[in-house]
Design a protein with these regions (language model features):
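Catalytic cores of nucleotide-sugar-dependent glycosyltransferases that transfer UDP/GDP/TDP-activated
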Residues: 1-495
Length: 495
């Protein structure tokens, strides 16, 4: 619903299936806490709508009953509660919680059972989330607080814009944020009627997708505007292969799509205050990185040598992350000479090959098969250069963490890696705004060329410090992301 001209601060209903620390399976949970918190600090009236999983209900200090619903004939009775989620000392998020034990009271995961299979009623579970989001964003809401904008996230809330489209009364504008296009929420066509969508919605100009109902396609098709997690990725998804079959529709809606980089928690990722590292430092005393470097070499069993370039990678070990290419490059890197530290888990074949590689050259290569948050901080603080050869990367986080720690990254030119890492181009030898290195072809030779460029720069002390300072000065805060979202909200309120 359009805003009163006298009220500039937007009212936003943020619909999500995850929010940290109550429920999280991946990055969406982090975003759903951090972005609304940053928006509230900028005076936006943002409130969250989340399913009442057991972890949500048990994690809240209080719940106040607001209303009871029988939303659709095929939906169980539902109660809406309100609560608040404390994010930090200064910010708490108002929460609306959908209490429906028949759909959400599950002993295992949010989306999957203990066998790793999708819950068979996921269409109803997240259809209810979407339907409630649409109801609260329309003149049919039982609440006095009505949003100007309903902000939907990934397929789980993708039906909200569709429900709003078929609501004949006043309704909020809708924003659909695409965090992960690979998961599209596809279900058999008989779910259309069960979820209360009209028959005419099941068409190519609607929710139909290769003979099935797709929640994600519905969100893309019906939303007033669309965002995704970096400007380059916003362009990439309009073409194969990164459109995952939706590239045609996304290209049709290109004028409605905006890419906004995710933020990072700059209080957690800050070498000046980091409790996990041996020696704290800032851009004014970068020499302290050497102390961290020697400590990490000792911890990982590498030769202690503060002058040899130390490269690092922290990642899920997978084909998508380019670790098959890194596996080819690692022996060449060790022969330069240079050192390599890797931390991560994933594909078992890659894990075994990387461990074997480290065993053949323990003074130069160290591999830790694990997820270790504290160690990841120490690696960022200690390494000279960070490796990120992802085949595709919608936004990426590790390249932002590394720059915060004065560790220039070497990245494949894709998605958010392009948008967050400024290449040291051959025609700018003084560094200027450069903060890292790009390589373009997804080959070992191209990757190795990028590493070679980095080593040349590393031995140019003045140039290397320029790269470090440039990266550490970049603003990767959630405040920066929130300001970009406020611009989108402003456009939606003017419609």
């Amino acid at each position: 619903m359009s805003s009163s001209p006298s009220r500039k601060n937007p009212r936003v209903l943020f619909v999500t299936s995850e929010v940290f620390p109550l429920c999280k399976t991946g990055g969406l949970g982090d975003v759903s806490a951090a972005l609304p918190a940053a928006l509230r600090e900028l005076k936006a009236d943002v409130r969250l709508l989340v399913p009442g999983y057991p972890s949500v209900l048990s994690g809240l200090k209080y719940k106040r009953k607001l209303a009871e619903f029988d939303l659709l004939p095929h939906f169980p009775p539902t109660t809406l509660f309100s609560s608040r989620l404390q994010i930090n000392e200064s910010v708490s998020l108002p929460l609306y919680v959908i209490h429906c034990p028949e759909l959400y009271q599950r002993p295992d995961g949010i989306y999957l059972d203990d066998d790793g299979q999708d819950w068979p009623d996921n269409a109803q579970r997240f259809g209810l989330l979407s339907k409630m989001g649409a109801l609260l964003a329309s003149d049919a809401s039982p609440l006095s607080w009505i949003p100007d904008i309903v902000h939907c996230n990934d397929w789980q809330s993708g039906l909200t814009p569709a429900y709003l489209h078929y609501h004949s009364g006043k309704k909020a504008a809708s924003l659909m944020t695409l965090h992960n296009l690979a998961f599209q929420g596809c279900f058999p066509p008989d779910e259309v009627a069960r979820l209360g969508l009209p028959p005419e919605s099941f068409s190519v100009h609607g929710v139909e997708y290769y003979g099935n109902l797709s929640f994600l396609k519905a969100g893309i098709y019906y939303a007033t505007r669309i965002t995704t997690v970096s400007p380059t990725y916003a362009r990439e998804i309009q073409h194969e292969p990164l459109g995952f079959g939706l590239q045609g529709l996304l290209a049709e809606r290109s004028n409605a799509i905006t890419g906004i980089i995710n933020g990072i928690d700059t209080t957690v990722w800050n070498p000046a205050t980091d409790p996990h590292i041996v020696k704290k430092y800032s851009s004014r005393n970068l020499a302290a990185k050497r102390i961290n470097k020697l400590a990490l070499q000792r911890e990982m069993g590498l030769e202690e040598n503060e002058t040899i370039p130390l490269f690092a990678g922290i990642s899920r070990l997978s084909y998508q992350k380019g670790y098959d290419i890194l596996l080819q490059v690692a022996p060449m890197l060790a022969d330069l000479p240079a050192q390599l530290v890797l931390l991560g888990k994933g594909d078992q074949s890659l894990e075994k090959q990387l461990v074997m590689l480290a065993q053949t050259n323990p003074a130069r290569i160290a591999v830790r098969i694990d997820y270790d948050e504290a160690l990841s901080h120490r690696i960022n603080a200690s390494a000279d250069c960070f490796l990120m050869p992802s085949r595709f990367e919608p936004c990426g986080l590790n390249q932002m963490y590394s720059q915060r720690y004065g560790t220039p990254p070497i990245v494949h030119t894709t998605g958010g890696l392009i948008d967050t890492v400024t290449d040291l181009a051959p025609d700018t030898p003084a560094g200027e705004s450069a903060s890292g290195f790009h390589f373009h072809e997804m080959t070992a030779d191209a990757f190795m060329n990028g590493i070679g460029r980095a080593i040349d720069a590393y031995y140019n002390t003045r140039l290397w410090k320029t790269l470090q300072h440039n990266g550490m000065r970049k603003d990767f805060s959630w405040r920066s992301s929130a300001l970009a979202y406020l611009s989108i909200y402003s456009l939606l309120m003017q419609r």
